[in-house]
Every structure is written in structure tokens, then in C-alpha cells.
Amino acid sequence: ISKLKNINKNSIISGVSYKEISILERFKKKGFKNKWILNPKKDLKIHDTKHNLETIQKKISSIKNFRRIQNLGKSDVLIVRHILEHCYDIKRFLLNLKKLIKKNGYIVFEVPDCEQSFLKRDYVMMWEEHVFYFTKNSFINLLRASGFKVEYFERYKYSYENILIAIVSLDNNQLSFNKKNKLQKNNFNNKNLEKDKFLIKQKIKKLKEKNFQICLFGTGHSALTFVNILNIQNQLDLIVDDDKNKLKMVLPGTNLKITNSNNLKNLDKIIILLGVNYESEKKIISKIKKINKKVKYFSVYKNSKFNLFKNEKFKKN
């Protein structure tokens, strides 16, 4: 970012939400002292202290004038991290972002990369707070169709879900589409979902025939998405989550109350379906082994080596 044309330590670096606080602090340490971030109360008229991105994006899309920003100075570099996928009115949101930057300014977008999840049918990608699921091609095409020129693009790799980063400038004359790098095959469809439902139920049925109990470990959005989309609520025997705030709550879609991991101690034949954060799987397995060494593991994530679909083939009688 600091190497962009016309950007120097006197440039104004800014952000639209709390998602940019850490990176703005990094800029400050590097000598960029002119910075601002949209204030929820002063700029967006948000008075609910428990607001989140769903409220921020809606307010940004609807505000006509950012009066305080006019006084602070429009941005040379506006950073917009992990909010675009939450937008209800993405056209209006992008139009209003343009009001926050100078004519020769830049916007840095960061969104989740869903391409591999589409190809692998990784259902836990889906989240009730996300309206859009971007691939490289759809992301770039959206920006170009919205009057931006893509100055820089990068796919930043992570262990589970990659990140798409685009630095754009204003270019209202450019409305071109890139037909290259299209998603080769859309595996996310009802036909494949029905196959996957069948595979999972058959696998669980075989495990239950061997007297294994099925325990869902973790009750975050990934676990709930997996359980409900693949319709395996009725095949779960135990729900475990060590978050004290969730204990004795009922898992949505079931009549099962959430309990803690101490209840795994005396179970002989138990299958743990890991629904925790992908990066936390090894840590959780290590923790469970201290409680019960007999436990076997599967994961809700397609990228995990404990993938529940692993080695399963579709064969319906």
C-alpha cells in the first residue's frame, strides 16, 4: 500500500469499521500519522452499542453525506476488510465508499475466497451473515462493473480459507468483464447435496451399527451449518461445547442440551464430529485425549485430514 503512486507519510489512511483498527495502528507505527476511521455514532448514527457489520454496512449504504469526513479530509487509502460480503445493497455501498476517497485515491478490499469451497462442496463455508460468496473472477468483475480499476490483486493463502485482496482506483469509464478464470465446475447444487446427505447418513448408520455414539464437539456456525444442511440432527447423541455461556442450552434443530467435555470420560465407543474452528482441531484433539483416549475423530471441514467424507463413495441401492 505504501508503494502506491502518490502515497507518502502525509497521506490520509482510513477505515470503515473496527476491522481496520489493527492495520491503521501498523501504519501509525510506520510514520503515517494522518488517519481516521468511521465513527459508528458520529458518522453512521448507530446508537446500539452491540451493533456489528450488518448494521455498519447498512448505514454506510444509506448515508447521504459524511460531514465529519469532509472536515477531516477525504482518504488517500480507504481500507475495507471483510464487510463487502455482508452487504444488503452492494451497489449503494460501493457508490458511497467513493464519497470517502479523493479523486486519485485508492480503496483496499479484502474478502473471503470461496472458490475452493465451491469446488469441494465445503458446506461450512455458508454463513447466515454472508450475502455474497466471492471467487476471484466474480470479485474482480464486481469491482470493474462498479467503476473501479484494479491496480493490484492478490490471493493470500491460509490453511483453511484464502483471502482475496484488491486495491482499486476510480475508473468510471471501465465497465469490462473478465471471462477468464471462471469457476471450472459448479459442484454446489441440489443433486450433489442429496448425494452428500446419503453418504453421511450411511457412514453414521454403519458407525451406529457398531454401537458408536455420535458427539458433535463445538456449536459455532460451522457446526450448525454442517448439521442442518446435511440434515443429521436426529443422528446426534451428544452435544459438547466448553463455552460456559452455552451449557444446558438446546442445539438448534434438536432436543439435545449442550454439555461440557467432562461427560466424555466414561464413554467407551464415541465418535467426535469436530465442529470447532479449523485451526483449533489439533488443540481440541489433544485436550480430548487427556479425557478419553478411546475417542475417534471426524471433522465437518472438507480440508481437514479428519474429513467425514473421506474415502466415501456414492453408491445408492
Indicate where each model-derived feature is located.
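Hydrophobic, well-ordered beta-alpha structural blocks that scaffold small-molecule cofactor pockets
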Residues: 1-7, 22, 26, 165-317
